């Protein structure tokens, strides 16, 4: 039984060395209690049923049953918060795990790096606090949140963004799932480019871009220095760099400061889009912890652009979007399921038109 008041943890990994490393990290913290270890997905399923841990750390490549199958079985029977702890080589598969119900993805920490260990522990604490629900066994598309409540649309705050506009999106915890649902719901190329800053562990952005590209009707790619923005394309910022858009509408990547808390910076991206696109800038702030992106939404709002925010009911973490809403920088607060239609409207597309 876990100690009272502590987060009970089940570690799932076929590597004894990896399990020992994770156990050591958790045992150094006062608020975690490792209750069991499993060497494959099949063992993990049985242990979850009997122990009901507060957190499962899940590897992906294991004998007998891998992490993907185990996650799907756990989330459709005895749902618990699952944090995928994976190597960068499994990045695309790791994001596939999120479509099966895993809460988040993190790289296996280097125990010689105090910063990596601290980031890992903070992520584990956050994931353990996120409510999860049992989900259907079969998913044909990423979950798009609850059924939207009909609302009368407010008058547009800016002209259609399709001609010279840029959509800039800020996201953190829960963002990969939200982005997947949003892109799937848009379902067609937009008439302007989309740039995205999603907080993510180093090395995983490329895998996330590949995963989103498999879902989206628009090409999704990892942003590259000097690349010119193209309408109907989604550009994802690497975590190791802060992305911005230049006056000539090219991508600029600046090496992030070592002690930067949020990686990559949402504020840097959104602020640059406000400066470049002005009234035709569209800022979207999705689910996530912290305040990164709030200043960027302020910049877009003050430039006369259009600002959208994901509502509390469809957010995994109502944090950065909540702050932007409270400060008055979000003109339209919408459930995740309504954001796609709003973006189609803003960019001048007809929601009912064929692609």
Swiss-Prot record:
EC number(s) given by UniProt: 3.1.1.61, 3.5.1.44
GO terms in the biological process aspect are: chemotaxis
Modification 4-aspartylphosphate occurs at = 59
Q: Identify one Gene Ontology CC term for this UniProt entry.
A: cytoplasm
Q: What is its main location?
A: cytoplasm
The reaction(s) this protein catalyses: [protein]-L-glutamate 5-O-methyl ester + H2O = L-glutamyl-[protein] + methanol + H(+); L-glutaminyl-[protein] + H2O = L-glutamyl-[protein] + NH4(+)
The record's subcellular location field reads: Cytoplasm
Q: Which residues cross the membrane?
A: none
Is the keyword Cytoplasm assigned to this protein? yes
- The domain of life is Bacteria
**Which residue spans adopt a coiled-coil conformation according to this UniProt entry?**
none
Give UniProt keywords alphabetically.
Answer: Chemotaxis, Cytoplasm, Hydrolase, Phosphoprotein
Biased-composition ranges, Pro residues, are: 145-159
Specify where the region named Disordered lies, as residue ranges.
Answer: 139-161
Q: How is it modified after translation?
A: Phosphorylated by CheA. Phosphorylation of the N-terminal regulatory domain activates the methylesterase activity.
Domain Response regulatory residue range list:
8-123
Key word Hydrolase present in the record? Answer: yes
> Per its record, what are the GO molecular function terms?
phosphorelay response regulator activity; protein-glutamate methylesterase activity; protein-glutamine glutaminase activity
Enumerate the spans annotated as CheB-type methylesterase domain.
160-350
Q: Where is the active site?
A: 172, 199, 292
What is this protein's function per UniProt?
Answer: Involved in chemotaxis. Part of a chemotaxis signal transduction system that modulates chemotaxis in response to various stimuli. Catalyzes the demethylation of specific methylglutamate residues introduced into the chemoreceptors (methyl-accepting chemotaxis proteins or MCP) by CheR. Also mediates the irreversible deamidation of specific glutamine residues to glutamic acid.
What family is reported? Belongs to the CheB family.
- Give the comment on domains: Contains a C-terminal catalytic domain, and an N-terminal region which modulates catalytic activity.
Q: What is this protein called?
A: Protein-glutamate methylesterase/protein-glutamine glutaminase 3
**Which species expresses this protein natively?**
Paramagnetospirillum magneticum (strain ATCC 700264 / AMB-1)
Gene coding for it: cheB3
